[in-house]
């Protein structure tokens, strides 16, 4: 409206999602609250638009800028960011290279290995997605092309695209339920008698719970800003269902420490683990940290590393 009043044209070019929230709704115009029918509706809507080619020329206005180091936002000792620099190389070129490596080396076995925490089996594109260094459309079409070119990659590709679907679902939920980061989507969980145990919360944050797989994951998070998705589910279940600490405290910690910290994904995932989301794991489903470690870190390599 402000643009119209000023006589300026205003157009929106969505690029953060595969499908805009207004485009994927039920037959009566309501948001989907269960993932499977939501994803079926997305697939029925057709393939996302093909990414546009890189422009041959861009015109930028000249602007003066200082380097981030000038702001002195981080202490020099200890160098808290060293682990991030050792683990991540930001930028579009690195994102595209990581996508290519994933498709070449890991996509075919993704469905079988994606939950392993002891091997590098996933794309690790989430930070690049979060910061807009690569678009979900680029990933979709690259994976779809690999699926059509290699029959061995079909199962892994379908599994991977489904994970992109969960990202879409999280964004759609946040769009329709903007209080999701703070309030359970199932109102019966509002008055759950959580524990206010600051010592237990601190032990979880520092990786000092005494459970090897939990502690390893929390230490990896602190040093690198990342942990595998399976590890996220394990530590989240431990905080919420073993320590009985509110899921919002865990979500806050993840937002502070994850390099791919994303409000939609983070909120929906924590509500899923806690059992208070729209399409969540049952409240009585508890991840056994010992059995999870045995299954997804069978030789203890992940625990020994961290």
Regions found by a protein language model. Name each.
Residues 8-13, 35, 102-105, 244-248, ...:
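Short linear motifs at secondary-structure transitions and domain/linker junctions
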